[in-house]
UniProtKB/Swiss-Prot annotation:
GO molecular function, one term: argininosuccinate synthase activity
CC annotations in GO: cytoplasm
Record-linked HAMAP family: Arg_succ_synth_type1
Location within or outside the cell: Cytoplasm
Protein name: Argininosuccinate synthase
Length: 406
């Protein structure tokens, strides 16, 4: 394949690994390289990536830096939160949900520039290789895919550094750079590697980059109100913001109060178990509020069906199937359930906790105090319950009369 590739679009961060990949592609494939850097809210200055690419011989017209923050939240994060998606009961899918957008945009740039190949920096052990490549092939099945970590022999940090030094690639560490393997976007930041590879070893406090420790969070709680329309967040404390602005604001609130830290061992799609630590402050608040709103606006059976389907939906995202027909089918059902998910939720934030203290919907609430009151009412005849119970017990009654014991 090396002689067949003429132009490749590389998912490029400007960091050491992808800079080495850039040079390796030039040397091994002797092809033209286009770099694509996505701004999905990782909180880093992206212009250095442009300068780094230029220093490695990339033409100015072959450098793409795109601000995808609003698209990321509006078209990926919000649809996922309509489903209340959680993988294996805990993980809010912060890395998983970012990969489809990057892959789609990378494939679009390949089409725009006439590139016949794409490349990424995911290793052969992780989930990201699957997520990226399923995304590429969903948009262009004819694209050639170059995954250097599955091809080269630079399989240690020492070999990577030696390669970088040999080719004049800057290997100086940024001041304050974490030794952990990290991935960040507007939804979360993740940490892997080093002491975390021992699941019995507690992470150091200085690992956490975003949030205060709950122990150091303010001693006073904070009350906030979130407004939703059709299941999506539209305002915080009455202030309407862009999708990216809303999630940024929620992150600020969550970090201030020590909300959203997670330490888990998860089952990777490729078959191994992996330990990761995550901070998802805004997403943790959003999930709690959205479920509270659904508690008054969704029909019982619709809510229960959603809960049954959610693990499948979450697994599809985790495993890289965002663009699959089955995910889109589930999304259509989920979105239909959100037509009446309109209203306001009041929350109290305090030392790592998110507590629902109120929920209301002017036109879509199914909560009717007249039916559920403990006081005297005129709308519900309690005698009707006897027949309801007897009908539901009929199979037990028949079995009992036949001598069957439970």
């Amino acid at each position: 394949m090396k002689n067949e590739v003429k132009k490749v679009v590389l998912a490029y961060s400007g960091g050491l690994d992808t800079s080495i990949i850039l040079k390796w592609l030039q040397d091994e494939y002797n092809c033209e390289v286009v770099t694509f850097t996505a701004d999905i809210g990782q909180g880093e200055e992206l212009e250095p990536a442009r300068k780094k690419a230029l220093s490695l011989g990339i033409k100015e017209e072959n450098i793409f830096i795109k601000d995808l923050r609003d698209e990321f939240v509006k078209d990926y994060v919000f649809p996922m939160f309509r489903a209340n998606a959680i993988y294996e009961g805990e993980y809010l899918l912060g890395t998983s949900i970012a990969r489809p957008l990057i892959a789609k945009t990378q494939a679009q740039i390949a089409l725009q520039t006439g590139a016949d190949a794409v490349s990424h920096g995911a290793t052969g052990k992780g989930n990201d290789q699957v997520r990226f490549e399923l995304g590429y092939l969903a948009f262009n099945p004819d694209l050639k895919i170059i995954a250097p970590w599955r091809e080269w022999d630079l399989n240690s940090r020492e070999k990577l550094l030696a390669y970088a030094q040999k080719h004049g690639i800057d290997i100086s560490k940024k001041k304050g750079k974490s030794p952990y393997s990290m991935d960040a976007n507007l939804l979360h930041i993740s940490y892997e590697g080093l002491v975390l590879e021992d699941p019995a070893h507690a992470p150091e406090e200085d690992m956490w980059r975003w949030s205060k420790s709950p122990k150091d969070a303010p001693h006073e709680s904070e009350i906030i109100e979130l407004d939703f329309q059709k299941g999506d967040l539209v305002a915080i404390n009455g202030e309407k913001l862009s999708p990216a602005g809303l999630l940024t604001k929620l992150n600020e609130l969550g970090c201030k109060h020590g909300i959203g830290r997670l330490d888990i061992v998860e089952n990777r799609y490729v078959g191994m178990k992996s330990r990761g630590c995550y901070e998802t402050p805004g997403g943790t608040i959003l999930l709690k509020a959205h479920r509270a709103l659904e508690s008054i606006t969704l029909d019982r059976e619709a809510a229960h069906l959603k809960d049954e389907l959610m693990p499948k939906y979450a697994s599809l995202i985790y495993n890289g199937y965002w663009f699959s027909p089955e995910r889109m089918m589930l999304q259509a059902l989920i979105d239909e359930s959100q037509i009446h998910a309109n209203g306001r939720v009041k929350l109290e934030l305090y030392k790592g906790n998110v507590m629902v203290i109120g929920r209301q919907s002017a036109n879509d609430s199914l909560f009717n105090a007249a039916y559920c009151t403990f006081e005297e009412d005129e709308v519900y005849n309690q005698k009707d319950a006897a027949g309801f119970i007897k009908l539901n017990a009929l199979r037990f009654i028949i079995a009992g009369k036949n001598g069957r014991k439970f």
